[in-house]
Amino acid sequence: MHEAQIRVAIAGAGGRMGRQLIQAAMAMEGVQLGAALEREGSSLLGSDAGELAGAGKSGVIVQSSLEAVKDDFDVFIDFTRPEGTLTHLAFCRQHGKGMVIGTTGFDDAGKQAIREASQEIAIVFAANFSVGVNVMLKLLEKAAKVMGDYSDIEIIEAHHRHKVDAPSGTALAMGEAIAGALDKNLKDCAVYSREGYTGERVAGTIGFATVRAGDIVGEHTAMFADIGERVEITHKASSRMTFANGALRSALWLKTKKNGLFDMRDVLGLDVL
């Protein structure tokens, strides 16, 4: 194996995101697909991961046991569901494997487990691995510092019908970026639903609206609205490959890290801007 290469394992190999990750891993220079995982009992077990993803034969067989492939990867990439990700996290912590986590919907206990594991292993944990989204988060911080104290702030997000959590992790990250720039805690100022007689809008709050429809990959808009004008900052994703490439880029970046909790802005160096 070339010194620059890093071997990755992909969780949820048969899912929409898993297949994109396999394609990206097989195409990206410096990355080697080392393992592909599916749940116990899946009809996809025993398949060639590359053929499953439509990327050609890879020689990597889809398996259900992390123990069986523990020597085949350096970084584990997980875009599944919180309960599965936390199981994988415990394994990676035990065996000293890095992780790239794109799973959303964690409760506070799950997030704390990730923080604790990062004391021993290196983790990139991000709500969205798109370069464009992370540039947007930086722009939101700057817009909030200028407009946030006198404008009404609303975040609108849209995803496909199969997404199971709301608001999206990216929408929450947008809210946290804005709230942080205003020296607020999002938990204290977020409004997640409006129905019936709500009264007038409460100043200083951040509203969220959610759409679930069709096959929308992901659309996010933050609105800063004042009397007579408004500024909207929008990101639209047309392919999951942008998230997959960002995740693989993060795995390569982790190569030199022993431990710590990072996000995509660290990978891209956006905090120095």
Swiss-Prot record:
GO cellular component term, pick one: cytosol
Protein name: 4-hydroxy-tetrahydrodipicolinate reductase
Subcellular localization(s) per the UniProt record: Cytoplasm
Residues binding NADP(+), per UniProt: 39
Quaternary structure (record): Homotetramer.
Pathways per UniProt: Amino-acid biosynthesis; L-lysine biosynthesis via DAP pathway; (S)-tetrahydrodipicolinate from L-aspartate: step 4/4
One GO MF term: NAD binding
Swiss-Prot/TrEMBL GO biological process terms: diaminopimelate biosynthetic process; lysine biosynthetic process via diaminopimelate
Spans through the membrane: none
Annotated active site: 159, 163
Entry's EC annotation: 1.17.1.8
KW Translocase (keyword) present: no
Binding-site positions, (S)-2,3,4,5-tetrahydrodipicolinate: 160, 169-170
Organism of derivation: Salmonella typhimurium (strain LT2 / SGSC1412 / ATCC 700720)
Keyword Transport in record: no
NCBIfam families (UniProt xref): dapB (TIGR00036)
Entry keywords, A to Z: Amino-acid biosynthesis, Cytoplasm, Diaminopimelate biosynthesis, Lysine biosynthesis, NAD, NADP, Oxidoreductase
Lineage of the species this protein comes from: Bacteria, Pseudomonadati, Pseudomonadota, Gammaproteobacteria, Enterobacterales
Main localization category: cytoplasm
